[in-house]
From Swiss-Prot:
Signal sequence, renumbered to the chain: 1-20
InterPro entries: C-type_lectin-like, C-type_lectin-like/link_sf, C-type_Lectin_Receptor_IMM, CTDL_fold
Keyword Signal: yes
Source domain of life: Eukaryota
Cellular component GO terms, alphabetical: external side of plasma membrane
Taxonomic path: Eukaryota, Metazoa, Ecdysozoa, Nematoda, Chromadorea
Disulfide topology: 114-222, 193-214
Residues carrying covalently attached carbohydrate according to the record: 26, 32, 81, 225
Name the record gives this protein: C-type lectin domain-containing protein 87
BP term (GO), one: immune response
Length: 233
C-alpha cells in the first residue's frame, strides 16, 4: 500500500497542477520523526545567474525561485582523472565523482552546495551512468538533478535542458508517464525542476523522474568531472 501511494500521487499532481512530493502523513523523513510537511516547505534560497558555463538562463523561467543572489567565492577546483580516487564519501563512475546529498534542500541551495564542492548537479551522459548513479540515491525519496524545463520555451520546446552539454536525451529517462510529455510528468510554469525518485521496491520501473516546484526540499546528487573542472577554472 505504501508503494502504491508513492506511485499514484505524482500522476494526480501532473494532471492537477502541482502537489507535494508523494509522501503521506504516515511517513517520516529519514526515520527521525520529522513531519513530512518539511518537504512541502519553501526554501528561501534562490538560484544564481553567475555561472556562465551553465546552459540555463534563469530569466526564461516563469518562477520567482530563480532570481539573482550573491554567491560564495570560488574554491580552487580539484581535477578528476582515471588514475585518481574520488574524495572520501564520493562515488566513482568512469571519469566522474558523485556526492549523494542527504540534506533536504530547495533546488537553489542544492545547486549552490554542489558548486561549493567544485561540481554541478548530476548530469547523465549515458543511460548506464544514469542507472548506476541514481541507484545509490536514498530510497523512497526524491533527489534533485541538473535538469530543468524553461517556461519561455513552453510552446516551442518540449524537452527540458541539462545543466551542462553532452548529456543524454531526456526522453530516454525513466519518466513516470511514458512516452515523455512535460505536463503529465508534473511540469507547470512553477514546477520547472526535475527530481529522481528511487523506489524501495525491487521493481526498477517503480523508480521514476518527475517535475516539482524548485522550492521543494529534497535530496540531491552532485557530479564532479574533469570537463566541469576545466570550465570552472
Amino acid at each position: 500500500m505504501r508503494f502504491f501511494r508513492f506511485l499514484v500521487f505524482p500522476v494526480i499532481a501532473g494532471l492537477s497542477s502541482v502537489l507535494a512530493a508523494p509522501i503521506t502523513s504516515n511517513d517520516t523523513v529519514d526515520g527521525s520523526g520529522e513531519a513530512p510537511e518539511t518537504l512541502l516547505q519553501n526554501s528561501e534560497e534562490q538560484p544564481h545567474q553567475r555561472l556562465k558555463f551553465y546552459n540555463w538562463d534563469y530569466k526564461d523561467l516563469g518562477t520567482t525561485a530563480f532570481e539573482d543572489i550573491s554567491f560564495p567565492a570560488r574554491q580552487p577546483p580539484v581535477a578528476v582523472n582515471q588514475s585518481e580516487q574520488c574524495p572520501d564519501g564520493w562515488l566513482r563512475f568512469a571519469d566522474s565523482c558523485y556526492w549523494i546529498e542527504t540534506e533536504l534542500m530547495g533546488f537553489a541551495k542544492a545547486e549552490r552546495k554542489c558548486f561549493e564542492k567544485q561540481s554541478t548537479l548530476f548530469v547523465a551522459n549515458s543511460l548506464e551512468e544514469w542507472d548506476s548513479i541514481r541507484s545509490h540515491s536514498k530510497e523512497a525519496y526524491f533527489s534533485w538533478i541538473g535538469l530543468v524545463r524553461f517556461t519561455h520555451y513552453e510552446k516551442s520546446e518540449q524537452l527540458p535542458r541539462w545543466q551542462t552539454e553532452g548529456a543524454i536525451n531526456p526522453t530516454k529517462m525513466n519518466w513516470l508517464i511514458k512516452p515523455y510529455k512535460p505536463i503529465v510528468n508534473g511540469w507547470t510554469s512553477f514546477a520547472n525542476c526535475a527530481a529522481s525518485y528511487k523506489s524501495p521496491a525491487t521493481l526498477e520501473s517503480a523508480s521514476y523522474t518527475f517535475f516539482y516546484p524548485c522550492t521543494y526540499l529534497l535530496y540531491s546528487i552532485c557530479e564532479r568531472n574533469s570537463t566541469i573542472v576545466n570550465v570552472m577554472q
